[in-house]
Amino acid sequence: SSDILDSWLADDTTKDMVSMERPETGKSYFYFFNFLPYAHQFPNWNTTGVDAQYQPDNWAKAVNSTNFRKAFLYAINPAVTLAVTAPEGYENYKLHTITPPSFCANSKGVDYTECGALAKVTDHFNEATAKQYRDAAVQELTAAGATFPIKVQYPYNPAVVDWDKQCQVFKQQVEGVLNDGFDFVEIIITQGPSDNFLNAVRRAGAYEFMSYYWGADYSDPETEVYPFYQEAGDRGTCYAFLRTGVEDGIITGETADYVMTYMDMVEKAKAITADLDARYAAFADAEAYLIENALVIPLSLPVPPYIATRLNLWEGQYAPTGFSSNRL
């Protein structure tokens, strides 16, 4: 934990044992919304949905509003959350894309994050813009019959060091922006189980808003779509349930169009197998479309934790993707 870092570094008997773990450059963290807040039976999985106390009907109206999602996109300051786990400096960990930089490059050596429409995506944090989208969302959601403040259930795993602190500073920062002048949202931090967290919370759809990560399995941008892409009728990887929300009629109108356009963009990109540059540009366009329509919100690279060890981690087995680096 960062709480004891200073004391260990100041102690001559322990300072030489402290180091940061090797950076995981194939992973990225992001925020995502639950587009399926109700129970659903898949052929190979069931979701329980959001508990009634968090008003899933009200949430369904809110998440269907692009103005609501964009209010979050522009209200979130990643630096606040990153400062919890990166007290020595966080600028190198901030991301404005889902795919990390230096993940792969096209035939001309152009980094994937600089390909296609992704090259135009920049940091979004802007309080004034966030409040403009909030005001538009208030008008839109009031007409749709929503009530305020919108409850936003935000769970964390107590077994993960500092995740609870990240949630607390996130709540303070985002509510400080979005509730300035109007009681817009109530971010409700909930503690999930330390064991079986994924099955009990994320894969069960028992949340409304969440932060989590995805790790690349191989060095091609197709691997980065799977938290969000779903084939028709399939559960996918049980992150945001974008397509299922549309198929169940929860997500409608403009947002449904965004979701299905993204699915189509991914399918067309996957079909490009002979032209690497065209393939990368197509995937980059799809990722940019996902972000700019606030279907996901980028956060950061993983901040390597400080550990006490006598091993030289740089002498161990390494690969930027997959599980190879877990072998000592």
Locate each region found by the language model.
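Solvent-exposed loop/turn segments at secondary-structure junctions
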Residues: 2-6, 25-28, 37-40, 78-82, ...
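Periplasmic binding protein-like
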Residues: 1, 6, 10-20, 176-241, ...
